[in-house]
């Protein structure tokens, strides 16, 4: 399925990378992979598919252009995006992770053949669409490697892996353990999966600089991510809940300054700013993530009182933000809180 085909006139095989979920993470990783590839004279091309609430086929011109800026050519279906891909990243909302993984498995298991009879060409796309120089991490004839970046449950990860095993693909459970826009290709990644899949991830040399191999089965990295979320999302939720009440009581500055002081001066100020504003932007996705956290904790025999509360709080914030424009990145936490009404 992964074809690792050579561009005509070039000794370097083309690595085709697909992003199912063509959002901010995909664009940052595509830019990083391309930069790493360019430094070594290798060839890569990118495809993407997105089915978000706002950005889905038929894509708006500005969304196509946004992805094109990092070399991603958008496809209209999952099957077109992953056809012939050597590496597939899955990065969607937590509650769509399992269904997306199964769709990828179905597409890879079936294969898509274009009019010329070549598996992996997106209809209407040339061999160089979205290409930048990158190398032969694409092993001719090798099974495609699917890298699941989703903050979903270990159970969902195992279900997806089983489907991909049946489809003949290799699978890596890769959990993002910090903020991608801040750390970019240096973001901490925990990975788990079968040894041959982990070896393929390492051999691909995509340019990630902070990878921790847990040397464990798929589902372990996602468990680490979920349990980290128990702390981080509950912390975000408690900050926003407290600050909203403080704003209504007319003492937002008093409460915020006290919290920041406890977190320790400038680091605390930056942390609190990021947590509060980040929640406004990603409440819906994080509510779905915390639904998975509640399920995981209960499966482990731990009562999920705090996580359930954080889930419900995030869902409420998502509803409040539904018809509101998020504040600008440079806005203060107070402005973000007031924007909720």
Annotate each predicted stretch with a short phrase.
Residues 224-329:
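Helical "substrate-binding/catalytic lid" subdomain
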Residues 327-341:
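Short, basic/aromatic-enriched C-terminal tail that caps enzymatic domains
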Residues 13-15, 144, 187:
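Nucleotide donor/acceptor-binding cores
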């Amino acid at each position: 399925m992964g074809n690792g085909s050579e561009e005509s006139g070039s000794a370097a095989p083309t690595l085709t990378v697909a992003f199912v979920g063509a959002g901010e993470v995909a664009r940052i990783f595509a830019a990083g992979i391309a930069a790493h590839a360019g430094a070594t004279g290798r060839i890569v091309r990118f495809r993407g598919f997105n089915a978000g609430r706002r950005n889905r086929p038929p894509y708006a011109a500005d969304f196509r252009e946004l992805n094109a800026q990092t070399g991603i050519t958008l496809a209209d279906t999952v099957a077109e995006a992953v056809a012939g891909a050597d590496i597939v990243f899955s990065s969607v909302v937590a509650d769509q992770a399992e269904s997306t993984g199964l769709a990828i498995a179905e597409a890879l298991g079936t294969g898509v053949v274009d009019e010329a009879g070549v598996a992996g060409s997106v209809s209407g796309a040339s061999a160089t669409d979205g290409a930048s120089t990158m190398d032969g991490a694409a092993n001719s004839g090798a099974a495609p490697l699917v890298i699941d970046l989703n903050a979903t449950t270990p159970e969902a990860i195992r279900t997806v892996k089983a489907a991909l095993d049946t489809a003949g693909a290799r699978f890596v459970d890769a959990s993002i353990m910090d903020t991608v826009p801040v750390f970019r290709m240096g973001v901490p990644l925990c990975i788990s999966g079968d040894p041959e899949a982990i070896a393929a991830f390492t051999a691909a040399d995509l340019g990630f600089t902070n990878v921790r191999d847990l040397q464990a089965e798929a589902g372990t990295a996602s468990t680490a991510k979920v349990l980290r979320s128990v702390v981080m999302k509950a912390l975000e939720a408690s900050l926003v809940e407290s600050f909203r009440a403080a704003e209504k009581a007319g003492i937002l500055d008093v409460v915020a300054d006290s919290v920041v002081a406890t977190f320790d001066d400038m680091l605390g100020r930056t942390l609190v700013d990021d947590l509060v504003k980040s929640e406004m932007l990603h409440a819906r996705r994080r509510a779905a993530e915390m639904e998975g956290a509640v399920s995981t904790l209960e499966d482990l025999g731990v009562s999920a009182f705090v996580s359930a509360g954080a889930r419900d709080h995030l869902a409420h914030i998502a509803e409040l933000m539904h018809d509101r424009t998020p504040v600008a990145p440079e806005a203060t936490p107070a402005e973000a809180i007031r924007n909720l009404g």
